[in-house]
Amino acid sequence: MTATDDTRTLVVAERLVAPLPTPWVGRVLAAGAVIIALRLWWSTSALGPRLVRDLVIFVALPGLLAVRYGGDIGWRVDRTAVRNAALLAAFVAPFYVVGSTLPTVRAYYPAWRTTLALGEFLPHAVGLVLVAFAAETYYRGLLCVGLRELGPGCVLVSPVVYALMHTGKPPVELLLAGPTDVLFGAVDYNSGSILPSTVAHGAGLVLLDYLVLRDPVIPPDRVLASLRWLPVPL
């Protein structure tokens, strides 16, 4: 066998071995399955109990896994993450504004009772941001940034589960859940941080509840007429 043949054999061997995932990937996928099972089993209604549940299963469990095995779940803040957070939040804000005018959305939100009184809405808003942080830690942190070694395709790991978790919400929200998951995952993947999706999601939830508690900023008839092509009730 010549030196050239040896080199070719080595290159082929490297190509066969390189794509094999590390044990961390298996741990992430196993933990992800256990966590979503706990999420389905542990039902809550009020915001307080919801926060306890989500912070335990969506934040504490992935956090313990990352600490135990030295994995990365996107808990990082740097200049790139801050820039992308601002850009993503600015991009999705109009969708929340338009969505706040839809009858099905206004009938569902706020998901937890609140008013615009500062003493009531402020703690409500903090709760929403924490809910968003918990969700992003699991869906985009554990199941996207945590699977970065799989390449860009890791953004496709969680959309189906994320969409299923929106069952029972307004149909238009369920329709957009999958694409939103992919968008948020792609930005977080390229940022190496869940800050962009956390800011966009948290700010969006607060903005949506604020707008729903007020008169529509855009005439609903105009919005309904422009979106009548969508295949879901609005």
Protein language model regions, located:
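Membrane-interface helix caps and helix-loop-helix hairpins in membrane proteins
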Residues: 43-49, 164-172
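Short, Lys/Arg-rich, polar N-terminal cytosolic tail immediately upstream
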Residues: 1-20
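Hydrophobic alpha-helical transmembrane segments
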Residues: 29, 82-86, 121-125, 153-160, ...
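Juxtamembrane helix-loop-helix connectors linking adjacent transmembrane helices
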Residues: 46-50, 70-134, 145, 149, ...
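Alpha-helical transmembrane segments in multi-pass membrane proteins
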Residues: 18-70
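Functionally important transmembrane alpha-helices
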Residues: 38-40, 44, 173-231
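Membrane-interface helix/loop boundary segments of multi-pass membrane proteins
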Residues: 134-157, 186-193
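Aromatic-anchored segments of alpha-helical transmembrane domains
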Residues: 32-41, 92-100, 159-167, 203-212
